[in-house]
Amino acid sequence: LNTLIKIPITILSLCCIFSCKTQHFETPEYGKNEAEKVFEIKKVHNFRAVGNIKNTEGRTLKEGIFYRSAHLHKLKKKSFDQIGQLGITEVIDLRNSKEISQSPDQIPNGITYKKYSAFEDEGDQLSQARKLVLKGKVNASDADKRMIDFYREYVTENPEIIKTIITEIMESEKPILYHCTAGKDRTGIVTALILMILKFDKETIYNEYLLSNNFRKPLVEKRLRLANNLHFLYPKMDLQVLEKLSWIEKRYLDAAFEEINKKYGSIDAYIQQVLGISEVKRAQYIQKFTH
């Protein structure tokens, strides 16, 4: 999505001349409780701490342990100190090989970097889909189905990688940052699984998930306005598709949980069978990460 349209800024001056149609964009669903700390780190979007929320046992998730964000490709060296001040010692990159090669993370020396892709995009489907979008051969309904399918497949197609990701995060003894490209889908799913393990209810989990819409709002609205103004360059492109791919919806996370229930019977069974976390280990994690 972030590289869907690459257009020189100088063309912006032509917008008022060639663009006359204004697209109406829907209002996304936002998280209602902004309890998490958001960090303004230049050129890094959706960077926040997962914490300050209560689970079903009344215990509060400790702050300063789990951090999530979008990619770190544009992280500036002068911002390295901010990462260091948070005590982050490890970064987990959830992107696929091509995404990483095109936009590698820029991280401070001394931080451990690991990459685990549960979606390797064989056949370069993302690139092909991008071309179809620009040619107007993908509509909003198609985009919605693609998102639903992606969420379903992410949690079940490569269970060993998902297990590795979760284990790496949960076994960490120091603050850890994990991210994908936009920090909303793959990162959102991983966060939801972590919170499920730690026995947070669905309302809390979904609220945390939807906060990506809150914190990405300025960026997304700017991109949608730009796409609308420059629509004359790609007149066949359905702008509602771009909108659909820019926000997240509860239904997407629903699809992931429904697929887990369908394939494994329950979330608890998935936690034990796929993630390899026993009830004893789960209780230990709850003690470790909450108070």
Task: Annotate each PLM feature.
Residues 182, 186-187:
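Ser/Thr-glycine-rich phosphate-binding loops at phosphate-binding pockets of nucleotides
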Residues 20-176, 190-291:
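Cys-dependent protein tyrosine phosphatase-like superfamily
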Residues 179:
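Gly/Ala-rich beta-loop-alpha elbow adjacent to hydrolase catalytic centers
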